[in-house]
Amino acid sequence: MLRRADILVHDRDGEPVLIVECKAPQVKITQEVFDQIINYNFSYGVPYLVVTNGITHFAARTDIAKRSFELLDSIPDYETIIRREP
């Protein structure tokens, strides 16, 4: 089931490359919350995901084929995201 993303960033060709999921500040971004969001967003086929509650932020690079993800140390810049390379 596909739903509207909170924020969806596109590359220069209009392809989606980053989804940002925004939670309320009082919602803690636990491993369970993050896992639910990343699994849900595999349906978009987007290589990057950010989850934030406005206080805490997590970024990940997804591997759609393997249905896995790698947490990143920081949110990548736009040029990195559109290269679609690790």
Question: PLM features: residue spans?
Answer:
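Carbohydrate-associated surface elements
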Residues: 54
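A short, conserved, highly charged catalytic patch centered on acidic carboxylates
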Residues: 1-48, 57-86
